Amino acid sequence: ALNRSSGQWIQTKNNNSKLLVDKRNIEILGVIGDVTQWTPINKTRLWVYHLHYFDYVSGDIQSNDSATIKSIIDHWIEKNKMGKRPGWEPYPLSLRVVNWIKFALNGQSISGDVLDSLSLQAWYLSRNLEYHLYANHLFRNAMAFCFAGLFWDTKYSEKWLRKGTSIITKEL
């Protein structure tokens, strides 16, 4: 179940958001590429990671087509099965979970498949935390847990929120 009693979400503008050029192309780090090619061989690893972050869905999307964004999210779910890299690496997964939740909280309806994927990604993250990297990676893992923990109202979400706040408290 979704947690709808946690207060009002204040929409934020992501000044670093990527530019969705059209229904298939996105500009990331000054380079345009096909948004449906999740592991392009002609792009840098950093570019590919940014593609999987989904930063462009969490900011001001008034100029973007939300139906296109939803289609891209659905395509990601279809093409990136659990554990498939680079999308399921903990750092890009953490950023994506937060961005998809922000997308939903910014007034966009999301499908049951997207909710299922978000839950699965949070569960997967709980088994693949980046303790070995610490710093920004572990912090982003913790933030994803906090967002997931507050977004849902389940026994798992309570654990995610506790885990996220515990990591943040310990690391700060």
Q: For the regions a protein language model found, what residue spans apply to each?
A:
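Extreme N-terminal leader/anchor segments
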Residues: A1-T36
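Short glycine/proline-rich turn/loop motifs
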Residues: T36-W38, E78-K79
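Aromatic-lined, polymer-binding surfaces characteristic
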Residues: T44-L172
